[in-house]
Structure formats: C-alpha cells, structure tokens
C-alpha cells in the first residue's frame, strides 16, 4: 500500500478529526447497508409491504449520500479517505415493520451519537469549519429522522403491531403510502 501524500490544501484540520471522519463514513455506509437489507426484506413476496420497502430504500440512499458528502469534505479539507470493511447487518429477517422501525430508530440514535462526538472533537480541536459543516448538513436532520422513526414506532404499537398483520398493512398503505405525496 502506498502512503498518502501530504495535502497542500490542509489547514487547521487535525489528524483526530480526519480519522473520526473516516469512521463516520464507515458508519453512514453501514447504515445504508442496513436500510438496503430492510428494503429488500419488505419487498419479498412473502412480506409484500411495498411502501416499507420504498421507505427503507430511500433511507439507504440518504445514508449513502451522507457518506459521500463526508468523503467530499475529507478531500476538501486535505484529509485522506481510508475506507474500512462494512459490517453485515445484525439481521437478515426483520420480522415485522415494527421491529424494523425500532431497529432503524436505534441505528439513527447511534449515528446521531457518533455525529455529536465528532462535533465535540471539532470543538475541542478548534475547527469551526467542521462544526459548521456538521450543524448545517447533519445534526438537525438526525433529530428530524429520530422523531419521524419514533412517531412510526408509536403509531405501529398503537395499531397493535406486530400481533396484528392488518396494522402493518394499513400503516404501509396509509402512512408510508402518503409519504409519496409529501416528498
């Protein structure tokens, strides 16, 4: 493996921040991979909840875009991208829409915690550019995603999921199906 050359554009970009960005890239790609797994689980003929599938596919694409945005930042700041292996999702069988939404909520909270730690590191290293980048592109979006998933979990539970298959079918049709009109 060749060693990375020194960047001529690097300024006020700490090595710890560079390493943390690379870890965040991996986490965002992992989240994308998990959502992709969820999407194609709900697309199976024996599950057949197409709006759950669409919802999670959209989330997968969004997480991949987050990783790409961080990669672009890494290059702009003069850092070097070092990709790691992406861990396999913990599940292959997501069991139910409720279980998948609960797992997604847990995942988004983990991503958010990692972003908060990255922001703290940027603050500690006196890197206002990285702080601004995270505040502008990530932190508020994470809070919104966590709230949306929390609402979905609450509504699925209120409807009697996962015991009631009808609950998940109706949620798929009327809640996630409606999201097509809002996007």
Curated annotation (Swiss-Prot):
Which CDD domains does its entry note?
Euk_Ferritin
List residues modified as Phosphoserine.
Answer: 179, 183
UniProt catalytic activity: 4 Fe(2+) + O2 + 4 H(+) = 4 Fe(3+) + 2 H2O
- Which Pfam families does the UniProt entry name for this protein? Ferritin (PF00210)
- Keyword Lipid metabolism in the entry? The reply is no
- Cell location: Cytoplasm; Lysosome; Cytoplasmic vesicle, Autophagosome
**Binding sites annotated in the UniProt record for Fe cation 2:** 63, 108, 142
Quote the function comment for this protein: Stores iron in a soluble, non-toxic, readily available form. Important for iron homeostasis. Has ferroxidase activity. Iron is taken up in the ferrous form and deposited as ferric hydroxides after oxidation. Also plays a role in delivery of iron to cells. Mediates iron uptake in capsule cells of the developing kidney. Delivery to lysosomes is mediated by the cargo receptor NCOA4 for autophagic degradation and release of iron.
The UniProt similarity line reads: Belongs to the ferritin family.
Protein known as: Ferritin heavy chain
As recorded in Swiss-Prot or TrEMBL, the protein's gene is named FTH1
């Amino acid at each position: 493996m060749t060693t990375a050359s020194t960047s001529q554009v690097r300024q006020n970009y700490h090595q710890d921040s560079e390493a943390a960005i690379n870890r965040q890239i991996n986490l965002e790609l992992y989240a994308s991979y998990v959502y992709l797994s969820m999407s194609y689980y709900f697309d199976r003929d024996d599950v057949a909840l197409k709006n759950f599938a669409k919802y999670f596919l959209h989330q997968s694409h969004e997480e991949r875009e987050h990783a790409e945005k961080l990669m672009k930042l890494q290059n702009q700041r003069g850092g070097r991208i070092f990709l790691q292996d992406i861990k396999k999702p913990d599940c292959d069988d997501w069991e139910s829409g409720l279980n998948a939404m609960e797992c997604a909520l847990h995942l988004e909270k983990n991503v958010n915690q990692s972003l908060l730690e990255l922001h703290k590191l940027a603050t500690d290293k006196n890197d206002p550019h990285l702080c601004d980048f995270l505040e502008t592109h990530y932190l508020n979006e994470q809070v919104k995603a966590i709230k949306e998933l929390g609402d979905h979990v609450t509504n699925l539970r209120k409807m009697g999921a996962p015991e009631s298959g009808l609950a998940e079918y109706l949620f798929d049709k009327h809640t996630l199906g409606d999201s097509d009109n809002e996007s």
